[in-house]
Amino acid sequence: MSFTVKVKEELLGHKSENKMELSAIIKMSGSLGLANHGLNLSITTENAKIARHIYSMLEEHYHLQPEIKYHQKTNLRKNRVYTVFIEEKVDVILADLKLADAFFGIETGIEHSILDNDENGRAYLRGAFLSTGTVREPDSGKYQLEIFSVYLDHAQDLANLMKKFMLDAKVIEHKHGAVTYLQKAEDIMDFLIVIDAMEARDAFEEIKMIRETRNDINRANNVETANIARTITASMKTINNIIKIMDTIGFDALPSDLRQVAQVRVAHPDYSIQQIADSLETPLSKSGVNHRLRKINKIADEL
């Protein structure tokens, strides 16, 4: 199950008491038709649970029992498109939800009573996300939450509504509409709080923390590996110089203090400078070991 589906299923588990959730769904997924008996309203979704949710809201708030139809885009079951079809009280619904424009169409922007009221705003954002919202999988590390709108002014109003909740929302135009989006992990988690998807918010944070911890461990391992590689490279240079000294003037030609360091270096190529210092009979600092190794290398270079 995708993270987007998890969020939507959590939202569908809540009882919807604010009609502005339905307002957003109709605004973003609804279309008006005209027949002999008057206006009709069709609300489409590819999610059967969302279709049932829309049915329940219409039944609760307007005492309607709309028809649910479906057709298939392909032969695959998952490609069903569900339509909640309403023929009664359409004008009442549009007026009550403040959706109708002056030309008996659906108003494209967001009504001020929604923008100016926090509870209405939260409900509207819930409906908007249920309708066209998606969240990129949090373990991808490329965080993004998007809500698609057919109309640019609606996308901009959505961004302004999100900004009222201190979210850094942005809008980008597409060929067939516009997208309101969030790209910061903290904004996405806060958005999930706003729409009351607390379980999804906690799951998002947990996945984010696990990923960041894994990345920190990998970075630490990479640094350690690089340090070991540098140590071994420097170690092999010194060992080759010690062999050169042994083959030319002989190991005993080195002063005893240099011989001690040389013996530990040859015996333990992977030792760090500190480990060499700790292995000597006479205690020595790291700088003291480095000084002796430089002297060994200098002797070899002069041969």
From Swiss-Prot:
Any one GO molecular-function label of the UniProt entry: DNA binding
Function statement: Involved in cell division and chromosome segregation.
Biological-process GO terms, alphabetical: cell division; regulation of sporulation
InterPro entries per record: Homing_endonucl, Sporu_reg_WhiA_N_dom, Sporulation_regulator_WhiA, Sporulation_regulator_WhiA_C, WhiA_LAGLIDADG_dom
DNA-binding region: 272-303
Species this chain originates from: Streptococcus agalactiae serotype V (strain ATCC BAA-611 / 2603 V/R)
Protein name: Probable cell division protein WhiA
Recorded name of the encoding gene: whiA
Family: Belongs to the WhiA family.
Swiss-Prot/TrEMBL keywords: Cell cycle, Cell division, DNA-binding
